[in-house]
Amino acid sequence: MARLDYDALNATLRYLMFSVFSVSPGALGDQRDAIIDDASTFFKQQEERGVVVRGLYDVAGLRADADFMVWTHAERVEALQATYADFRRTTTLGRACTPVWSGVGLHRPAEFNKSHIPAFLAGEEPGAYICVYPFVRSYEWYLLPDEERRRMLAEHGMAARGYKDVRANTVPAFALGDYEWILAFEAPELDRIVDLMRELRATDARRHTRAETPFFTGPRVPVEQLVHSLP
């Protein structure tokens, strides 16, 4: 991979939206080819408004209340809102969906390590599996001395050193919803995310996590596979 221009990437404003939906059983009927064509065309057209569809993810069964998740990102949050609204209003798939959860984050430079760039922004290919969750730090976290927070974050990073195949996308979400951060882990295999998450529990920074649910996890799937799998 070419050397990254960290200054340019950290100067980039990029909003991310993770939107989770459920579908009522039978709402899509049995004949789904037209639904697939409609949804495929819609997602491809989003590039014209500057929206990148990073992936569609099957979260069915990993949660009882949701069937799939869509990850989009763009320079302007209004573009993401338009994609979200148009999907629900203009596509057969979207009209059959009920929103379960949606969260927005914005890339900003990491506080202590400016080379910590989200995988999607660094130009990395999407992972085969994803785990997305929001989190909120303790009230004390932001009042701690910089060196103490730096130490804990460095320890947190060291705990992940054996999982270089698990790529992190950590973005602030202050004022964009009910959370302070949104994190999306991407990996070639799901067990790698599971093992990493367990490792990260044994770090001091864990003491300063006040909330970190809900979790949305599953494989990245093409539109055709997703639509055929829906109830």
UniProtKB/Swiss-Prot annotation:
Pfam families membership: Chlor_dismutase
Binding of Fe-coproporphyrin III, residues: 156
Functional pathway: Porphyrin-containing compound metabolism; protoheme biosynthesis
InterPro entries given in the database record: ChdC/CLD, Dimeric_a/b-barrel
Annotated active site: 133
GO biological process: heme B biosynthetic process
Catalyzed reaction equations: Fe-coproporphyrin III + 2 H2O2 + 2 H(+) = heme b + 2 CO2 + 4 H2O; Fe-coproporphyrin III + H2O2 + H(+) = harderoheme III + CO2 + 2 H2O; harderoheme III + H2O2 + H(+) = heme b + CO2 + 2 H2O
Disulphide bridges: none
Record carries keyword Heme: yes
GO molecular function: heme binding; metal ion binding; oxidoreductase activity, acting on the CH-CH group of donors, oxygen as acceptor
Cross-link (Isoglutamyl lysine isopeptide (Lys-Gln) (interchain with Q-Cter in protein Pup)): 44
Listed cofactors: Fe-coproporphyrin III
Assigned GO CC terms: plasma membrane
Keywords per UniProt: Heme, Heme biosynthesis, Iron, Isopeptide bond, Metal-binding, Oxidoreductase, Ubl conjugation
Enzyme nomenclature, EC number: 1.3.98.5
Record NCBIfam families: HemQ_actino (NF042928)
Protein role: Involved in coproporphyrin-dependent heme b biosynthesis. Catalyzes the decarboxylation of Fe-coproporphyrin III (coproheme) to heme b (protoheme IX), the last step of the pathway. The reaction occurs in a stepwise manner with a three-propionate intermediate.
Protein's name in the database: Coproheme decarboxylase
Primary gene name: chdC
